[in-house]
Amino acid sequence: MNKMTPEEIETALKPIADWQLSEADGATAIERVFRFDDFVQAIAFVNKVAERAETAGHHPDIHIHYNRVRLVLSTHDAGGVTSKDLEMAAAL
């Protein structure tokens, strides 16, 4: 799986709402913050993300802050963002 350039990522993100280019552990990543009414809804969302990630065999970094969940996607083996990350972002 080939690592994408920042320009390729920006173009690919245009149809995927609210995801943005970022950096995680020195590698290019994409991330999005999801907001919920309360902690219970946030955790229910995290559980759905976990199921989807297990099915896909591709796991985001998940940061939980009460009613906010920040997901960060990057393909660690490739050292940056690949099509796997964009597919997961679009599915969420």
Swiss-Prot record:
Keyword field: Lyase
Protein name as it appears in the record: Putative pterin-4-alpha-carbinolamine dehydratase 2
One function term, GO molecular function aspect: 4-alpha-hydroxytetrahydrobiopterin dehydratase activity
Parts of the chain that traverse the membrane: none
Family assignment from sequence similarity: Belongs to the pterin-4-alpha-carbinolamine dehydratase family.
InterPro entries per the UniProt record, alphabetical: PCD_sf, Pterin_deHydtase
UniProt source species: Gloeobacter violaceus (strain ATCC 29082 / PCC 7421)
Superkingdom to which the source organism belongs: Bacteria
EC numbers, comma separated: 4.2.1.96
